[in-house]
Design a protein with these regions (language model features):
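Juxtamembrane and boundary regions of transmembrane helices in multi-pass small-molecule transporters
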Residues: 3-30, 103, 163-166, 170, ...
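Hydrophobic mid-bilayer segments of alpha-helices in multi-pass membrane transport proteins
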Residues: 5-23, 46-66, 81-95, 146, ...
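Flexible interhelical linker loops that connect adjacent transmembrane helices
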Residues: 36, 113, 226-249, 284-293
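Transmembrane helical segments that form the transport core of multi-pass membrane transport proteins
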Residues: 65-77, 101-105, 251-354
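Helix-loop-helix module between adjacent transmembrane segments
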Residues: 92-98, 118-119, 130-142, 174-183, ...
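Membrane-interfacial helix-loop connectors
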Residues: 135, 141, 145-175, 188-207, ...
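Short "domain-exit" segments at the C-terminal end of structured domains
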Residues: 372-388
Length: 388
């Protein structure tokens, strides 16, 4: 019990740390640039490393509690499964490459041209309504990264107003979050629990998917109506794109499809990833810089959650089992304001014999809300708002 209480305490400290990152960044400016104190405080101010950092503290605390480093190693190696963090790392890097991004842009542009509106308006609708649903197939982190790159090029780099910028960011986060629920293998909150709860494709589509798709379209139309005048006033970007051979785009799509297909087999999809890195190196004239840093940070973030999750069942089980569907639904609403939705569903999956009603309430509410503490969202926000 001591180890479980310790794990919960460290998990709570990690959550509190996420709220203090801005303060650490401010303190860092009080020290000379390049000094130990300045670098340490900047390190502590990185949101994406918070849960991984505290997970490393948990590792050594676990070893100290058992008076053996081997017990801690055994816990990491044999009691935890890091397949999902590894998968998210790989799929984010593969999906954010120039051939895949340009293919997605052409697909979205084809949908946009079906709408009898100016392209700056129709592309906005197609990206945030139709594009958000891509997260159900190429995964939520990949779709988030890909759509952010398209929106940055066509809107954020063209001096849109702050209200439109923040409305677009919020709409992107929510739509991609709920748009990943058409399938059982794409969104991290679903991916973390689908196999344990035996939720397949048809279950997700019939219970969550159609509702999510409808919500994406309605919310996008509302935001578009509010900012229609500003979207109409924007100038079209330069339509020219650097040539990419069809065969190379096909190979990239094949690699992405293979990674998704083998998502439950880390040794296999990492092998595909190694081949992909070789392909990118050999065809560097058609490539942009890989988003390795972003993928690694998100993977590290999710891995930290995995380390903590297994030791939280002792307090979650009695808490959740004493709730009905409505109580859990609104409780999850409050929790997603301060923690990651993948963490919430992962923690909930540790409770045995959870009813179908409670499972639905937990996933529905955690997918419906996003918080500023979610690492993929935080990175995308930084990408969109940085200067060109």
């Amino acid at each position: 019990m001591f180890v479980k209480v310790l794990a919960t305490t460290l998990f709570a400290l990690a959550v509190l740390h996420t709220f203090a990152v801005k303060k650490f960044a401010q303190w860092a400016h009080h020290y000379p640039q390049g000094s130990l104190q300045e670098n340490l405080l900047h390190f502590l101010a990185e949101t994406e490393i918070v849960f991984g950092l505290w997970a490393s503290v948990m590792f050594f605390a676990y070893a100290a509690a058992h008076r053996s480093i081997h017990h801690a190693v055994e816990y990491i190696e044999n009691q935890l499964d890091f397949t999902e963090p590894k998968f998210v790392l790989v799929v984010m890097v593969v999906a954010a490459t120039r051939p895949v991004v340009q293919l997605a842009e052409r697909m979205i542009l084809s949908v946009a041209r079906l709408l009898p509106l100016k392209e700056t308006v129709s592309f906005f609708i197609a990206t945030l309504a139709f594009g958000s649903l891509l997260g159900s197939f190429i995964t939520e982190p990949a779709a988030m990264t890909l759509l952010a790159m398209l929106l940055k090029d066509r809107y954020f780099d063209r001096g849109i107003s702050r209200p439109l910028a923040y409305a677009t960011i919020g709409l992107l986060f929510v739509n991609v979050s709920i748009g990943g629920t058409l399938t059982h293998f794409a969104a991290p909150p679903v991916l973390m629990v689908a196999s344990k709860w035996n939720w397949g494709f048809w279950h997700m589509l019939s219970n969550f998917g159609w509702r999510s798709a409808a919500a994406c379209f309605v919310s996008t139309l509302i935001v578009t109506a509010i900012f229609c005048r500003q979207l109409n006033s924007l100038q079209l970007p330069d339509a020219s794109r650097r040539f990419i051979p069809t065969w190379l785009t096909g190979l990239h799509v094949a690699c992405l499809a293979a990674v998704v297909y083998f998502s439950h087999y880390p040794d296999v999809f990492f092998g595909v990833f190694m081949l992909f890195l070789g392909l990118v190196t050999a065809t560097r004239e058609y490539q942009d810089s890989l988003k390795l840093k972003e993928g690694l940070l998100v993977g590290f973030f999710l891995a930290g959650l995995v380390v903590f999750s297994k030791l939280q069942a002792w307090w979650l089980e009695p808490l959740i089992q004493n709730m009905n569907g409505s109580m859990l639904y609104y409780g999850a609403t409050a929790l997603t304001a301060i923690t990651d939705n993948a963490a919430l569903t992962l923690l909930g999956s540790q409770v045995p014999n959870l009813s179908d009603e409670l499972k639905f309430a937990l996933l529905a509410r955690s997918e419906e809300h996003t918080s500023e503490l979610q690492s993929p969202d935080h990175l995308v926000c930084r990408l969109l708002l940085e200067k060109k």
